Amino acid sequence: MVSLKDRFHCPGYKIVEDRRIRCHKVGGHGAEDFAQGIMNSCNPVFIELGLRLGSEKYYSYFKQFGLLQKTNVDLPGEAATIMHNPKNIGQVELATISFGQSFQITPVQLATTVSSIINGGNRVTPHFGAYVTDEKGKKVKTFKYETTEGIVSEKTSETVRMLLEKVVSEGTGKNSAIKGFSIGGKTATSQTLPRSANKYIASFLGFAPADDPKVLGLVIINDPKGCLLYTS
């Protein structure tokens, strides 16, 4: 469907049917390959990929990644994903879904899904307990949790880790780079409803080490102030 060296052109927007959907860089990123599109968080690149996949295939990936079901985190009251009925996904809806808008997932779901993709491709269930210690700090019980079947291949997982490391070392997430550490991550900006309010949510998800993740963190800022709406 796409290779890292596939070429794209970003003039600052993408025309889909009768809509002009903007990139965050008004003047556009110009010529770029797919890897650079990820690093630049370029909407037209994500839109083009979504249109190549088509709504049926895209929706199937939502199912494959577990995004249409709850994570079963061990806390009550978990909210479910809000997503279009597949029958109602036209070209414009698919275009906006492809760069992370027009649907809603919880922060726990986002962290869970990314963890599952970058850990080699095995779906995990988030938990709040790893082990129990006594008053001296000695482990007296270690909880063991099952992982499920792979949602992506090991090769795909490796490629995603590599791309997200470049986001931090060279792309929109470079403010989160720390000398001596290998970090992967992704910036994100989503517009809230109603769109006429012109309000956004900025977020950054990071993990380390980039080649063998052991820790992942997610920062979310509601209605950030300033000219840059992505965060790192």
Please provide the spans of the model-predicted regions.
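Short beta-strands and strand-coil junctions in structured, solvent-facing domains, enriched
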Residues: 225-226
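Beta-lactam-recognizing serine transpeptidase/beta-lactamase-like catalytic domain environment
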Residues: 1-221
